[in-house]
Amino acid sequence: MAQGCPITGLEVALTDLQSSQNNVRHHTEEISVDRLVVRRGQAFSITLYFKNRGFQPGMDSIMFVAETGPLPDLAKGTRAVFSFTGSGGPSPWIASLEANRANSLEVSLCAPPIAAVGRYLLKIRIDSYQGFVTAYQLGEFILLFNPWCPADSVYLESEPQRQEYVVNDYGFIYQGSKSWIRPCPWNYGQFEENIIDICLELLEKSLNFQVDPSTDCALRGSPVYTSRVVCAMINSNDDNGVLNGNWSENYVDGINPAEWTGSVAILKQWHATGCQPVRYGQCWVFAAVMCTVMRCLGIPTRVITNFDSGHDTDGNLIIDEYYDNTGRILENMKKDTVWNFHVWNECWMARKDLPPGYGGWQVLDATPQETSNGLYCCGPASVKAIKEGEIDLNYDTRFAFSMVNADCMSWLVYGGKEQKLHQDTATVGNFISTKSIQSDERDDITESYKYEEGSLQEREVFLKALQKLQATRSQGPHQANSNPFSSVPPRHNSARSPDSPSLQPSDVLQVSLKFELLDSPKMGQDINFVLLAVNMSPQFKDLKLNLSAQSLLHDGSPLVPFWQDTAFITLFPEEEKSYPCKILYSQYSQYLSTDKLIRISALGEEKNSPEKILVNKIITLTFPGIMINVLGAAFVNQPLTVQVVFSNPLSEPVEDCVLTLEGSGLFRKQQRVLIGVLKPHHKASITLKTVPFKSGQRQIQANLRSNRFKDIKGYKNVYVDIGL
């Protein structure tokens, strides 16, 4: 400065947060290009432009302030004060001088890898020579978890995994049954417009924030804490969470869960209605919406499906199922069930609250089943702890263990009494599935949750879990009847296969029963199958067999039986006989649930023995999907024509047909097309235009619903080029 010129306070004229450049470096450019969204543990640059002069290190002292939450507190780490010389305190932030020009200053700032995530206000205080002090608000930014930062507790080493579990905004959720695993496309849309704001709003609507906002904001640096808050907020059982659950088959005042194809419409509806819960969701919808929120916040997350999933309500690692003497499954008196499939999330994080070795993938289940510390949430439970039977480790590991490894006990109820029929040690936990990394294929990750069925290690882990449970609880009168501690049968010595028969021999009767399908059961067609009876003894056997069929919800809840039959079979020594069965479409069509699941059962008895034998099989009716064709190459900001081909698989007309389509980066909002009536076995197609607004790999998701079916789905992967 020239001699004689008065020294004035340094005044900021303009701040450039360099949002576009910073967001690219922080992998948040799809969230926004004009708002600063950065990740903790990684530097970002800003430029300060001054009014009157440049920054003079000997005469000017700059102090930065970063604040989050309604009551920023230095001690709690929600307020940070730091300068170019560093800072102290529980969560040190870093400021570095990058370039000092005539009237501007380029600065690099970095939040510590333990900083609380959320919305921040950045301020500056400048102390100049002779006591001049100026202070400014430089702007707002959003801070997220950083799986690219080795010091962050959500660090994930593999770049392909980071791309799949943080960046990818579409995927598949597996449904159906272990014999017919069906990939259902889903639009996570974590980078769609306003989704980041809705995710932060979700945190602020939590009970934790409402009770103690200061502490809640301070704890948001922990992915363990944050994931539990999000998990509780996805369902609405304790609060104004995102989704109402409904398994009643009555959805007249909302949306059938099977019709959803993405999270964006759900989250935006929740926000637009003043945070009123959206109607309705079931397990895969809860898990999909949670995946969207967690990926948006920066925690690596994937969606997991477990086929034949145990729901053990009383915590004894036994799933009790009850049948009457016709073979009909009864509404469970204890509410234990085996869900045909159940869907939850895995989130990747360190677990410093647990012994070494239990970090990595953690189970989080937002479906409201049981409470955890008074709230309807489940987890995070270490997948490693589940596999090792460490059911006493936080959080809710016992419940998660039972979902994949409980035993099943079958009971016959008659004359006010209960007779034990069978204890099955191999039913629960099959084909645990998730989408492959950067592929449309399915990954089977069952071995991450349990040792091979029938192995010594698997048996030892199960017994360890039982011993831990026995040490922490006492059994009630009814539980004593199904007490697994006194006599635990050995596990079947065979690996599971989707085609393995449900052969259940009785040691007393020396008779086995199993069902065999004669053809693949399709929606709208008759179901043909046989009951195979085998006499494994040297004596004659006179059998009476009561057969029944009833629809199931995917959570295992039975509906009204619609078919019954009685068979009398005489078996010569070591003879095998087949009893043919047929269920007409006209017999089951009016009784189907949305899930299109039918359970056939047979209860057998031999006239010279009081023992009973039970066999059952779950049938999933298949149906054709939707075909989507993209006509021509796709370019950003250029019209694209999409053709959708669909059909009515039934021999009767269906009404109220509605087609919905969506896809992040392809459609600004969900498209809804009224089709009306589809004639029997009629194939139809429509074309529509859209203008892609994001480049890269994208996906179109489609759903067709009618008065007779709700979830005929299809998808199409589309690569969108930037163009010229």
From Swiss-Prot:
Q: Which reaction does it catalyse?
A: L-glutaminyl-[protein] + L-lysyl-[protein] = [protein]-L-lysyl-N(6)-5-L-glutamyl-[protein] + NH4(+)
Known cofactor(s): Ca(2+)
What domain of life does the UniProt record list for this protein's source?
Answer: Eukaryota
Q: Does the record bear Cytoplasm in its keywords?
A: yes
Q: Where is this region: Disordered?
A: 473-505
Q: Where is the active site?
A: C283, H342, D365
InterPro entries, A to Z: Ig-like_fold, Ig_E-set, Papain-like_cys_pep_sf, Transglutaminase, Transglutaminase-like, Transglutaminase-like_sf, Transglutaminase_animal, Transglutaminase_AS
The principal location of this protein is cytoplasm
Q: Can you list the GO cellular component terms from the UniProt entry?
A: cytoplasm
Q: Which Pfam family is one of this chain's hits?
A: Transglut_N
Q: Which residues carry this modification: N-acetylalanine?
A: A2
Cross-referenced Gene3D superfamilies? Immunoglobulins, Transglutaminase-like
The EC category is transferase
How many and how are cofactors bound here? Answer: Binds 1 Ca(2+) ion per subunit.
Record: residues binding Ca(2+): N405, D407, E453, E458
Q: Polar residues bias: where?
A: 473-486, 495-505
Keywords from the UniProt entry: Acetylation, Acyltransferase, Calcium, Cytoplasm, Metal-binding, Transferase
MF terms in GO: metal ion binding; protein-glutamine gamma-glutamyltransferase activity
List the cysteine pairs that form cystine: none
The EC number(s) this enzyme carries? 2.3.2.13
| Task of the protein | Catalyzes the cross-linking of proteins and the conjugation of polyamines to proteins. Contributes to the formation of the cornified cell envelope of keratinocytes.
Please report which protein family the annotation says this sequence is part of.
Answer: Belongs to the transglutaminase superfamily. Transglutaminase family.
**What is the name listed in the Swiss-Prot or TrEMBL entry for this protein?**
Protein-glutamine gamma-glutamyltransferase 5
Q: Which gene encodes it?
A: Tgm5
